[in-house]
Structure formats: C-alpha cells, structure tokens
Swiss-Prot record:
This is Hemagglutinin-neuraminidase. Residues 48-577 are virion surface. The C-terminus (head domain) is involved in binding the cellular receptor. Its EC number is 3.2.1.18. One of its GO terms (cellular component) is host cell plasma membrane. GO terms for biological process: symbiont entry into host cell; virion attachment to host cell. Keywords: Disulfide bond, Glycoprotein, Hemagglutinin, Host cell membrane, Host membrane, Host-virus interaction, Hydrolase, Membrane, Signal-anchor, Transmembrane, Transmembrane helix, Viral attachment to host cell, Viral envelope protein, Virion, Virus entry into host cell. Gene3D superfamilies: 2.120.10.10. The gene is HN.
C-alpha cells in the first residue's frame, strides 16, 4: 500500500518538474523575443532617423509642398506638350497633306501627258523649277495676329518680260488673261492691228510657260510654247486656264459691237480651245443655242479660269432674253452691298428701286445683265459636257467680267465693279455635281475702281451703271482656319478717270503703303494679279499684269509688274524706277 502511494507521488513530482522547466523555457523565449524586438527598433531608429510623433505632424505639410512643386513643374511643361501635340497631330499632317496634294497634281498632269505621248498627241510636260513646289496656288501667308496692312509690296523688280508688245503706233494689245497651276502658267491677250476700238478683226496671242530661277536667284517667267491665232475668227473677251492638258481657253467670236450684240436675238458664238504641250492649238465651237438658249449675248469673264474636280471653270456674263425662263426667275431679285462706315443716305425704298434697276442698264437696251459660271470637262475632247450655272441676283450684282480663283482648298469668283459698287468683291465659291454656288462676298473698301458719276470710286448708293475697270484682287493672307484676311492687287487710284495704277495689300477696310507705277497722271486699264512663293528662300512674290498707256507704240502696253511682299510697320511709299 505504502509502496503504491510512493510510486504515485514520484510520478507527480516528475510531472511538476517538467511543467516548471517548460514555463522557464517559455519565459526565456519571450524575454529573448522582447530584447530582439527592442534592439531591432533601436537599430531602425538609429539607421533611418525615424520621426517622432511630433515630427509626423508636419508630414501632410511637406506632402502638400511636394505636390505643389510637382504641379508647378508639370504646368511649366504643359505648354511644351501642347506645342508638341500641335506639331505632331495637326501641323505635320497638314504639311504632309499639302505636299501630297502638290505631288498628286504633278502626277495627274504627267499621266495626262503620258497618255498624250502614247497617242502621239503631245510632248513632254513642262514644269516649274523645284524652288516653286508647294508655293503656287497655296495660302501663302497664314497669320492670325499681324496687321494685314503691315505687309506691303516692294518697288517693282526687273525681270524677263514674257509679254509681246505692239510694234507700230497703230498696234493694240489688250485684255490680258493669266492663270498658273502647280506645273505651268498660261497667258493670252488680244491683238488689234488698227487701234483698240476696232471690233471687226483681231488675233489672239496664247502662250504656255514655267517659272524659273536664275543662277543669281532671280525669278523669271519662261515661255515654252506660244501661238498667234491669226485667222478669220475674231476672238474676243478670252479667258485662259492652266489645266493638265495645257492651256484651255474660252472665247466669244464676234463681228459686231457689244451694243449691237445685246440688241440681237441669238446668243454669241463661243469656242473652247486648247494649246497643248506640243505647241499645237485645237478648238471647238460650243452649242450656244442649247447652252445659252435664254441669252442674247454671252462673253467669258476675261479673267483666268480654274481647274477644279477634273473640270475647267470660267466666269461668264451677258444679257438675258426678256421673259425667258432664266430672265423670269431673276425678276425682282437684287442685292445691296454697303460701303464701310459710309452709309447711303437715300430712303430704303428708293435704294431698293435703284438696286433692281441696276441689273437692266439702258446702254444695253434694258436687257438683264447676268453673271454666270461655265464648267467644261477636261479631256482630250474639247467642249465636253459643258454645264452653265446662273447664280441668283440675291447674291451677285449686275453681270460683269470676272475671274475664278483657287487658293489652297478655297475657290473664289471675282466680279468686276461695272455696277454701282466700287470696292473689289470676292465671292466664296463651292462646287458640287458640275455646278457652282456663290456666297456673300468679301469686300475690300480701299480697293476701289474709277467710274463715271453716279458710280464713281466714292459712290455709296445703288444706281444703274455700266462703268469701272477690271482690276482683280488675289487672296494673299489667311487666318489659320482658312478664312481670308487680305488680298494683293493693282488698283487704279482715280475717282472717275482710269489713272494712277498702284499696287498694295488690302484688308476689308484699308490698304498698306502703295507702290506706284509712275506719276498720278499715268493712264492705265485692266490689271490681273497672281501671287506665289519661292519655297527655297521663303520669299513671296506677286505679279500684276497691267495695261499701261504707251504713247509711242500703241495705245496700251501690257506690262508684267513683279513685286516682293515685305513686312514692317512703316507707312512710306515705294515707286518703281
């Protein structure tokens, strides 16, 4: 019995001893863990300089300051990022598109010529020097900020005269027409042998050429093909256009005076001709009885045409047959354009009555003088698919000479100020399905033309007139959104008489310093202007082809006046030598 109790007691002592050692072990482990943790914390505090609770209070402030610095840095770089985006996403693709357009135009022209060569119908293609690639038919000055009139023409520059002049005192060269494409230019004028007022016989000079740059860097126009159309056909009022097949020309054929033509009952004969790259001229009469069935007189606008969407577009004008469908649809329609800051004082009802009567001047027997646009498909067949567009007289003034221009992707119609409105007009034009639509015009108040009273240069009220002179403006300065800002042109700076030719840059209300041809008493007549850029030097030039009085050899001499467009804020006046 005692032995059994002793055995139990021994086992209990052993169990208690084991538990005691387990407790000691656990306490030792816990102590070592705490010591290790304390040492680790101490090491961390020492090595990292860890903040105390008081230090942690300032952390949000430091974070805010760092955030402000980062924001400031990003903000200063935003302008750079924006410029990079504009260059990469906007300007570079646009520049590539312009280059692509130029290349495609050249390829189109070459393809026409290759086909012509295959058919033994043409020679090789003339093309401007590489210095001009991308500088013809483009928006030459794109500037949102500068004053338009801070751009101005230099004195006239000496260059090669590519226009033949009269060789006798009775000779007469008149009515120049000019157009230039990305590959070549076209020029024509009328030649009369016995004085400028002879309507019975004349011949037409027609030339094709290219822009060259001389070894010294001068611009010159090089004529490569030309022809004198001296036959039994009396071509008048011719307009020319540079197309992929050469120089397309639209002319009327007349044997009577203008007044007699308007008093006739049938439309005027009209022909579509072409000077090809091989120097050969071909021509085809249009079916005017169908095309101009409602007209008693019809003439090209004299100014150059334009090649758009595989068609050549010309401005035309003339007289409508009374009570014909085309005449009836215009009945009661009119438009009144107003001078800048110079309102007509007449009563509104009287102004409307005068505006309506301005379309039927007495000089042409009371016929409605109408503006129109003729487009013809450009192909190896002449006169193909002609389409006539007659715009409403709620947009256009009385019909007059004009010009179709293409600059960049924009098209315009210039209308001569033959009616009461003296400032130069450029109607924006859109084309679709072979027809054209005209929109409210840009007006250039300081770009006036002389005229007979009551439609002189300073006129401000509607009146029936047939006056003025052809002096077209060329679109030169644009906003970045392609809106037109300013034009270049050579005006006749007289009130009533055709005197004082002067070149300038014009905005809607004013003009730059001017470059005069000579004295204020110099007689002149028609002027037509075209601008281009020498891309290599980034210099912009403008050519004004002007009829200048010539007392020794003929009444007029047609002179190609060349200027460079300069820029500053001066107001001096330049004069040619």
């Amino acid at each position: 019995m005692d032995r059994a109790v002793s055995q139990v007691a021994l086992e209990n002592d052993e169990r208690e001893a084991k538990n005691t050692w387990r407790l000691i072990f656990r306490i030792a482990i816990l102590f070592l863990t705490v010591v290790t943790l304390a040492i680790s914390v101490a090491s961390l505090l020492y090595s990292m300089g860890a903040s105390t609770p008081s230090d942690l209070v300032g952390i949000p402030t430091r974070i805010s300051r760092a955030e402000e610095k980062i924001t400031s840095t990003l903000g200063s770089n935003q302008d750079v990022v924006d410029r990079i985006y504009k260059q990469v996403a906007l300007e570079s693709p646009l520049a590539l598109l312009k280059t692509e357009t130029t290349i495609m135009n050249a390829i189109t022209s070459l393809s026409y010529q290759i086909n012509g060569a295959a058919n033994n119908s043409g020679w090789g293609a003339p093309i401007h020097d590489p210095d001009y690639i991308g500088g013809i038919g483009k928006e030459l000055i794109v500037d949102d900020a500068s004053d338009v009139t801070s751009f101005y023409p230099s004195a006239f520059q000496e260059h090669l005269n590519f226009i033949p002049a009269p060789t006798t005192g009775s000779g007469c060269t008149r009515i120049p027409s000019f157009d230039m494409s990305a590959t070549h230019y076209c020029y024509t004028h009328n030649v009369i042998l016995s004085g400028c007022r002879d309507h019975s016989h004349s011949y037409q000079y027609l030339a094709l050429g290219v822009l060259r740059t001389s070894a010294t860097g001068r611009v010159f126009f090089s004529t490569l093909r030309s022809i004198n159309l001296d036959d039994t056909q009396n071509r008048k009022s011719c307009s020319v256009s540079a197309t992929p097949l050469g120089c397309d020309m639209l002319c009327s054929k007349v044997t009577e005076t203008e007044e007699e033509d308007y008093n006739s009952a049938v439309p005027t004969r009209m022909a579509h001709g072409r000077l090809g790259f091989d120097g050969q001229y071909h021509e085809k009469d249009l079916d005017v009885t169908t095309l101009f069935g409602d007209w008693v007189a019809n003439y090209p606008g004299v100014g150059g045409g334009s090649f758009i969407d595989s068609r050549v577009w010309f401005s035309v004008y003339g007289g409508l047959k009374p009570n014909s469908p085309s005449d009836t649809v215009q009945e009661g329609k009119y438009v009144i354009y107003k001078r800048y800051n110079d309102t007509c004082p007449d009563e509104q009802d009287y102004q409307i009555r005068m505006a309506k009567s301005s379309y039927k001047p007495g000089r042409f027997g009371g016929k409605r003088i109408q503006q129109a646009i003729l487009s013809i498909k450009v192909s190896t067949s002449l006169g193909e698919d002609p389409v006539l567009t007659v715009p409403p007289n709620t947009v256009t003034l009385m019909g007059a000479e004009g010009r179709i221009l293409t600059v960049g992707t924009s098209h315009f119609l210039y209308q001569r100020g033959s009616s009461y409105f003296s400032p130069a007009l450029l109607y924006p034009m859109t084309v679709s399905n072979k027809t054209a639509t005209l929109h409210s015009p840009y007006t250039f108040n300081a770009f006036t033309r002389p005229g007979s009273i009551p439609c002189q240069a300073s006129a401000r009220c509607p009146n029936p007139c047939v006056t003025g002179v052809y002096t077209d403006p060329y679109p030169l300065i644009f906003y970045r959104n392609h809106t037109l800002r300013g034009v270049f042109g050579t005006m006749l700076d007289g009130v009533q008489a055709r005197l004082n030719p002067a070149s300038a840059v014009f905005d809607s209300t004013s003009r730059s310093r001017i470059t005069r041809v000579s004295s204020s008493s110099t007689k002149a007549a028609y002027t037509t202007s075209t601008c281009f850029k020498v891309v290599k030097t980034n210099k912009t030039y403008c050519l004004s082809i002007a009829e200048i009085s010539n007392t020794l050899f003929g009444e007029f001499r047609i002179v190609p006046l060349l200027v460079e467009i300069l820029k500053d804020d001066g107001v001096r006046e330049a004069r040619s030598g």
